[in-house]
Amino acid sequence: MFLKYILASGICLVSLLSSTNAAPRHLYVKRYPVIYNASNITEVSNSTTVPPPPFVNTTAPNGTCLGNYNEYLPSGYYNATDRPKIHFTPSSGFMNDPNGLVYTGGVYHMFFQYSPKTLTAGEVHWGHTVSKDLIHWENYPIAIYPDEHENGVLSLPFSGSAVVDVHNSSGLFSNDTIPEERIVLIYTDHWTGVAERQAIAYTTDGGYTFKKYSGNPVLDINSLQFRDPKVIWDFDANRWVMIVAMSQNYGIAFYSSYDLIHWTELSVFSTSGYLGLQYECPGMARVPVEGTDEYKWVLFISINPGAPLGGSVVQYFVGDWNGTNFVPDDGQTRFVDLGKDFYASALYHSSSANADVIGVGWASNWQYTNQAPTQVFRSAMTVARKFTLRDVPQNPMTNLTSLIQTPLNVSLLRDETLFTAPVINSSSSLSGSPITLPSNTAFEFNVTLSINYTEGCTTGYCLGRIIIDSDDPYRLQSISVDVDFAASTLVINRAKAQMGWFNSLFTPSFANDIYIYGNVTLYGIVDNGLLELYVNNGEKTYTNDFFFLQGATPGQISFAAFQGVSFNNVTVTPLKTIWNC
């Protein structure tokens, strides 16, 4: 998270939140107002504590819901037109990196960097939400608060990860805590101008509240740029491994431990790939190779700023882990997502050696996230994605082992299909004809593009174009996707998706070369202000924010075919909201 660089540079950020370290961490509020902006959210009451509830308990009286800051939310709160309907967003405040993704006891926990009282990155906490299907989320109380030191100076819980200490290697749990509930959070204790150190917290109530370890920090190398620990279990070495960023030294350090408390350095993977200003939010996983019984290790590194499109991006390396070192297969830099708005991706921890590799990314960019024109919240997460590896053609002579991403469980949200067409070509009356979408509703589209090469093919004209217009009366706002067969290029244009709001770094249009070795499949998830595009069954992905004028949402989609290009097997399907209030 770029905030870390700002704070480490000594720039003071003003926060509205006073010390919360002494306050109980599981509280209800006394009442709620009609919420129009973040400052109207009712303060948390210090007078009434609530015992840890069972799963599915966060519906408050009179049809309201519980927010991420323990506030009651009025019915219809999540229906605001500037809020995505199927992507997780905080009830209020500012959210960035996903943290501590862990699956245990049939429940997916997702923690996240959270500034609950401001709409810009500030006094970071660990927010918390849970799901049984990676689609529908319930808000839980804040898991980790800042620590207050002398003279009111705060140290902040920066990004990290979570594990299930099934065998109680840490000794933090009693026999009364069942193994599946022994969740340990590993995070960076960021003390501005002093140090970044790794610390842990643990739960004794199944993951509802957390207590900081009294012996923190568990790893301190006397550095101001040492953060974002990802801890995994090495099944071959039978020990814990921490992957942590030595951010401005461009290093990813590996440490081992048998108890999550005492750590020994193993190696450093350094100065590889795209550098940017700094490394952040590393991760590593053993990923299956499609069509085989083989696995390869993948090392993820976020960089910011310094992305090819500017700002934030996540790169990865394919290789092997020998228990001490990560050894890449090649020096090729690969990017997880080629859009403008994907950063700080995190992977789910599971106690199973052969569990699916599942991850989530922060759908924003530090170049403009603090100015995004949303009213009571800022930022969203991508839908959960399953990762595999596949040999993907790069040109007629070379394949490259590449990450394949598949969105998970979106099918649970599908409504009745709105539109189907077996083919749309340039001579079809359907080419360019608008399809009206339900108001304030997410939707998906699925299409295969093909080209008749017997016809002339000219760059800029031999293409298929998908246009998503807003529902404002004049259709002045839109976002579009072009597949140009002559140029072997995919173009995303969001120049008309920032009306009423302007940021010079909000790249209006960008193109990416794609090697077209046959038909091109496109699967898109379009939510209020967010597009996730998956090309050729996840060989490439593009995550992009867009901002229509306040009150406007996607209202039409059209498929325009030019010069020998055809859209085949076209479907458009609305998606039901994930929220019940």
Swiss-Prot record:
Coiled coil segments of this chain: none
This protein's GO CC annotations: cytoplasm; extracellular region
Family: Belongs to the glycosyl hydrolase 32 family.
Residues modified by glycosylation: 37, 40, 46, 57, 62, 79, 168, 175, 322, 399, 409, 425, 446, 452, 519, 569
UniProt source species: Schizosaccharomyces pombe (strain 972 / ATCC 24843)
Residues forming the catalytic site: 97
Binding-site positions, substrate: 94-97, 113, 158-159, 227-228, 280, 366
Substrates-to-products reaction catalysed: Hydrolysis of terminal non-reducing beta-D-fructofuranoside residues in beta-D-fructofuranosides
Recorded name of the encoding gene: inv1
One MF annotation (Gene Ontology) recorded for this entry: sucrose alpha-glucosidase activity
Known EC number: 3.2.1.26
Cited PROSITE patterns: GLYCOSYL_HYDROL_F32
Top-level EC class: hydrolase
Protein name: Invertase
